Amino acid sequence: MINEHFERIVKEKFGFDFSPTQQAAMKNFLAFLFDRHPESLFLLKGYAGTGKTSLVAAIVNTLLQFEQQVVLLAPTGRAAKVFSGYSHQPAFTIHKKIYRQKNAREGVGIFNLGFNGNANTLFFVDEASMISMGSQDSNFGTGSLLDDLIEFVYNGRNNRLVLIGDTAQLPPIGVDVSPALEADFLQ
């Protein structure tokens, strides 16, 4: 039905036949997409060169064709630029999207978690392995980028999160594995 139609359009936009792992990822994404649990999260992991970003770009452009709101994010400006280049859609750093500077009386250079005015939106975050739990000394939000990102996304009405990353990449400083790519941790 709609799942098959959606998948067919993604395949057309992708431009190649899916590998077995991409086919499995597509099947799992469709289950996530049509799951109406309000706080569900989709985790897409794969090594470099497996086609994660290309698959997500095809999914994003198909979602836009169906008039689904999407926001594309990445931890760094460079990663956001690459994500935007693949998807042909604007992408932003996580910090730019979720934080707002406090007013001058409260302190210059201090950033609070901003208001999320998005509703019914899928937030896609590429290079999620770079997202850290942070430190208390941070000038941004709670000091935990991952916690702040999750809080920001789910503070909006009917928003959900898709985290994309490579477990073979180095984790954030001070941890052995990237918490943003650990399903057990995210639950």
Predicted segments, located by residue:
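Conserved ATP-binding/catalytic motifs of P-loop helicase motor domains
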Residues: 1-187
